[in-house]
Amino acid sequence: MKKLTIVGAGWAGLSAAVAATQAGWHVALFEAAHLAGGRARSLQQNFAGQPLDNGQHLLIGAYRDTLKLMRTVGLEPDTLLHRMPLDLRYANGEGLHLPDWPMPFNLLAGLGRTQGWTLADKASLIQAAWQWQRQHFECDATWTVTRLCQETRLSPAVVTQLIEPLCLSALNTAMHEASATVFLRVLHDALLGGKGSSDLLVPRVDLGALLPNACLAWLSQHGAEIQLGTRLTADRVEALHNAASADQALLLACPPWEAARLAASISPAWADQCAQLQHTSIATVYLHCTDTHFQGLARPMLALPSSAQAPAQFVFDKGALSQQHGLLAAVVSACTTERDDISEQVQAQVREELRLTHLEVVQTVVEKRATLACTPQLDRPASFVTEGLWACGDYISGPYPSTLEGAVQSGQQVVTQLSQVTHG
C-alpha cells in the first residue's frame, strides 16, 4: 500500500489526509501541537463551558469544498453553521444587506433598500459590477484594490462600507496593498457562484468541533496513524524524504515558515521562497457584556465603522450562535496594533458604537502570522518541492487568498497531483 506522511494537522493537512485515505494511501499524520486545526483551532480557555477559538472565522456559501469535506467526515454544515444572506449593516441599519434571492435580483433589491447611500452611491456600484462582469472579473495584475476602486469610480460610501470591509475580511490586507486580481476572483465566486454563494456562514460551535475533531475521528476509523504533540526535526524530515519512493511520499502541511525550516537542506530555493513571504495579523477581542438586561445584538454579526483608533471591522454575538450568552467577538483584520492597545481600543469602540456600558475583556487573541499579505503579483511557492516531497497550505500557489477554503482545496489538489504522479 502507498504511504503518505503528512507533517501538520491544520485544515490543509487534514483535508489532504482525508483525500489521500479515500485515494487508497496509508496516512501517517504528525502535528506539533496537542490540538489539530492549525491557525483555525480551539483554545484551552473556556467561556460558559465552551472553548474559545484562536480567532473568529467566517465562511461563505462559495466554500463548497469545505462544506463537502464536513459532510465526508460525518458532519452536517446546516447544523454547525448559521447561514444568512450577505449582511454588512452597522448597528444603525446603514449598509448593504442582500435578500435570499438569486443574483442579480438580490443585489438590485439589496441596493434598493440600503440605508445611508445616495442614488449616486448605488449607481456607482451597479456600474462597477457591470464593468467587472463585462471584463470577466479580471483587471491589470499590478492593481491594488484601491486602484480598482479608483478606476471604476466607486463612491466613497461604497468603498468605506462595502469594498474595504470585504477586502479586509477576505484578503486580510489593507486596500492600498491588496491584490485587485485576487479580490475580483473572490467576488466572482461569491456573486456568480450560484444561489447562496454569497451567504455568510458563521460557526455555531468552536473551531475544533467545526471540522478538525471529526477529521481526526474519521481518519482513525479508516486506519490512519495520528501523532499529536510530535514535532519533527529537519533531520527526521530529511530521512523521510530520503526514503521516499514511488509508493512513499512526504507532504509538508505546516505553515510556510515551518515548511521553510524543514525543507531548507532538501530544496533551498523552495525554502527560501517560503521564508520570503510576508504575513498579516488578525486580532480577536472577546468581550463579556455583564449587563443583566442584555438580550443580545440586533443581528448575529454587525459591521463596525472602523478607524485607526477604533480598529474592529465586525462584531459577532456568540450568545446568538451558541450557549455563550453575553460573549462578543470583535475582529480586527490586518491588525498592526499591540495586544494591550488593541484590547482597550476595541473595548471602547464596541462600548460607544453599540451603547454597551458593562463590557469586560475576556481574552484577546492576536494571530501574528494569520495569513499571507495578499499583494499584487505575489510569487507563491508551488506544491511540488522536489521528487518525493510536496507541500500544501493556504500559502501555496493558487487563485485564492489565505482562507479556510484555500487550505482545504490545497490539500485535496496536492493529493490529486500525487496520485497522477504515482499512477504515471
Where are these regions (language model features)?
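Conserved Rossmann-like nucleotide-cofactor binding loop
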Residues: 12, 35, 257
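Glycine-rich FAD pyrophosphate-binding loop
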Residues: 21-46
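Conserved flavin/dinucleotide-binding core of flavoenzymes
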Residues: 44, 101, 313-424
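Mobile amphipathic helical/loop "lid" adjacent to a hydrophobic cofactor/ligand pocket
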Residues: 63-184
